[in-house]
Amino acid sequence: MSTDNIPTQLGIAGAVAVLLFLLRRWSSRSTLRNIPGPPPQSQWTGNLKQWFARDGADFQRDVSFNYGPVAKIHGFLGRPILYVADPKALQTILVKEEQVYQETKAFFAMTYLLFGPGLLATAGEKHRKQRKLLNPVFSIKHMRHMLPIFYGVLHKVRDAITMRVSDGPQEIDMLKWMGRTALELIGQGGLGYSFDKLVEDGDNEYGRALKHLQPTLQRINVLRRLIPYVYKLGPAWFRRMVMHYFPLGQVRDAKEIVDTMQRCSSEIFASKKIALARGDEAVMKQVGEGKDIMSILMKANSMASEADRIPEEELVAQMSTFLFAATDTTSNTLARILQQLAIHPDTQQKLREEILAANAEEYMAYDDLDALPLLDGVCRETLRVFPGVTNLARTPTQDTILPLSEPVVGTDGTVMREILVPRGTEILIGIQGSNGRKERWGEDSYEWKPERWLSPLPKTVTENPVPGVYSNLMTFMAGRRACIGFKFSEMEMKVVLAVLLSNFTFELTDKPIQWNISGVRYPTVGKDSNVAQLPLKVGLYKKPTLQ
């Protein structure tokens, strides 16, 4: 074949590719054009900048609550994106036909680059094998064995904060302390490794990397959607070189953060592998005494059949995945709880009295701690009203029909009881919309009211359940790809609150707090700061003396 024809052939191929893209775009737009939603802000980026903007919380709430259980926003070049909070539709997407509705290419590419081939970045048979190996170590039975580890960490946190407020109430960045606490809890309970002595100010290398990850990713949010098209470009060394010399500093920052996380995970894995090879005595001398998740996981993997065993690369990736998933989400939720308790001092005092009456500060058995009603209500209500993660998506691998539990009225007045969804359409999972719909939760659904969990939930919730794995909520998602560690997170929050509220009071400062949109929502002082923090006025609680 003559090389003279190559430019012509490339031009034809490019034209065909553009034509196919435009045809697909027209097809999806014509099918979904009748779904209600806000107008595009831009012909090029649609509503993406509004949705993913750092201050996009109001826009997300508007889409979640003002356009019905199914809405439409616009992506690149006007391509429609569905927002789905309808219970029947969610059941179809996440459970009944989960093999049809896959995570987006952007999600898989991003999580692979961040954490490696772990649970978040895999699908199909590889994901099934990983999940099968992981399920036992996240069971309630195993959580019970980890409770002493949790209390041990929290007593160190208690002593450290006590030193800082012994002379009177002080302003303390509780997001930082919750981040250090969550990292140490997953370190000891998950990896059998101590990251932080929790005495000195400051944090360690891994903690700093995690703290800066979400703000850094947020600043390249729209750019991240292009990753599926470039992340396999050339060999790995070439991609790393491109990132190193990329003109945007945030991209280089993200690379350095990922490098730090991967290096730390590899070092921890290597030390655990040596201890396991030496035998039980060496393992018992490690933090967690061999009861941590990774020690049990590595032992189980070594004894698994060849068909079920996973390679070391995937085990290391699980460590990075655990550390990320169990640190930012839980620490930011705990910071949100403390802020809400500062806003609602009566609830704070009632919760404190419940905890003190149960003697939950020093140690409490798993089932007893889990049964404290107001503590449970505070955790559930915060997870309902303020889900930390709201930007999860699926994409159908074929044209499909999405059934609805209630009809949607189209922009032309047509009543739709099902929706034809073209292959490749991005579907945003309506976590916030599902958790807060007035039709399910009542007129006060937007309000933070922990006491709603102290009595039976309304029939509109119990008789029309969503498929979420946790408490009629979508916060931890549903189906085979639901959050595997939600019980770990719930127990962590309850132990933290039991110890902190037994010893300290929390009040607001005069600094304005802004919660920002990112992969995991995070707080800053004001809307312009890039530093994730939540300052609260912390004082010692004076326990009543017994007469």
From Swiss-Prot:
It is found in: Membrane. Its cofactor is heme. Pfam families: p450. It comes from the Eukaryota. The chain crosses the membrane at residues 6-23, 106-124. One of its GO terms (cellular component) is membrane. Keywords: Glycoprotein, Heme, Iron, Membrane, Metal-binding, Monooxygenase, Oxidoreductase, Transmembrane, Transmembrane helix. Heme binds at residue 483. The keyword Signal does not apply. Its EC number is 1.-.-.-. CDD domains: CYP_FUM15-like. Pathway: Secondary metabolite biosynthesis. Cytochrome P450 monooxygenase that is able to use dehydroabietic acid as a substrate for oxidation. This is Cytochrome P450 monooxygenase 81. It comes from Postia placenta (strain ATCC 44394 / Madison 698-R). The lineage of its organism: Eukaryota, Fungi, Dikarya, Basidiomycota, Agaricomycotina.
